[in-house]
Amino acid sequence: MASVAELKEKHAAATASVNSLRERLRQRRQMLLDTDVERYSRTQGRTPVSFNPTDLVCCRTLQGHSGKVYSLDWTPEKNWIVSASQDGRLIVWNALTSQKTHAIKLHCPWVMTCAFAPNGQSVACGGLDSACSIFNLNSQADRDGNIPVSRILTGHKGYVSSCQYVPDQETRLITSSGDQTCVLWDVTTGQRISIFGGEFPSGHTADVLSLSINSSNSNMFVSGSCDATVRLWDIRIASRAVRTYHGHEGDINSVKFFPDGQRFGTGSDDGTCRLFDVRTGHQLQVYSREPDRNDNELPTVTSIAFSISGRLLFAGYSNGDCYVWDTLLAEVVLNLGNLQNSHEGRISCLGLSSDGSALCTGSWDKNLKIWAFSGHRKIV
């Protein structure tokens, strides 16, 4: 049998070996943290996405609103768009023909957000009335073409900044609000199922401006706030945030999950877009443009969207630009603001069609524009 001294010696050697492995692992992790997507991609020989001004063209201008356009959403499967405007109306458009199928006059004109239900048969909207209104598009219209509200979701103590249906669930909707919370609703009953934040210490400490539900795992969603953080939530555990993500230096106006659900992007008042890893919390990339020559300030990022592959990031800005970023190399491959028939005001919202073939942008110039990849251009 081994003596006590020999056992102690073996224990010391094993401990030293474990500590050495731990140190090597720590150093390796630190090396990975110091490597962003851009540098890694370049070391792997990735080439930039090449774009010509004719690769993405404005094929439709949707005119009909008499006020600033604040929000838009595509149907998951069909070519329909809903838009919300300062004129106090929701308009449902046929994206292929530019035809308006519904022009719904709202009881509260100060609308900030709108969303289609997964089946495309209902739309939701919210704003300064602190409520989320649901409209069934199959309802009988009155003489003026308006349809009645089918359900009003009340309970927020501040404006409703964003709303999104849970994918593949017609009866579940999540809203974000100026009361620093997000709420999961049962649309059928109008009741709150869960409240995220508020009295719980892990919640946001300022207005919540945006949210995005993970299409790969609809139990998870992220919220962006005026407290310059993003929080990850599990709808099954409302009492605490799963993780908090830092990095921005201004209000986070837009959050959007990456197509694979493992990452998400953000757009902020600090003028940057950022890409985060959901699991590790690591900031993978920063997409930052040069300041305007006139005032030396960065325009704010108002809205973002990813292409279906995730290789492109579309970002709308307060000065009317709409940049197309190469997400791997952090390079701008196109600015829609420089193209023919571009917007003449702030880009307030944007979204990609479900098949990735078209981008819709909304602006304070009262118009929406549909941008399509030209025939010879492969969708990325």
UniProtKB/Swiss-Prot annotation:
Gene3D superfamilies: YVTN repeat-like/Quinoprotein amine dehydrogenase (2.130.10.10). It is found in: Cell membrane. GO terms for molecular function: signaling receptor complex adaptor activity. One of its GO terms (cellular component) is plasma membrane. WD repeats lie at residues 64-94, 106-136, 155-186, 203-234, 247-277, 296-326, 342-372. GO terms for biological process: defense response to fungus; endoplasmic reticulum unfolded protein response; fruit development; G protein-coupled receptor signaling pathway; jasmonic acid mediated signaling pathway; lateral root development; plant organ morphogenesis; reactive oxygen species metabolic process. Coiled coil: none annotated. InterPro entries: G-protein_beta_WD-40_rep, Gprotein_B, Guanine_nucleotide-bd_bsu, WD40/YVTN_repeat-like_dom_sf, WD40_repeat_CS, WD40_repeat_dom_sf, WD40_rpt. Guanine nucleotide-binding proteins (G proteins) are involved as modulators or transducers in various transmembrane signaling systems. The beta and gamma chains are required for the GTPase activity, for replacement of GDP by GTP, and for G protein-effector interaction. G proteins are composed of 3 units, alpha, beta and gamma. Interacts with the gamma subunits RGG1 and RGG2. This is Guanine nucleotide-binding protein subunit beta. The gene is RGB1.
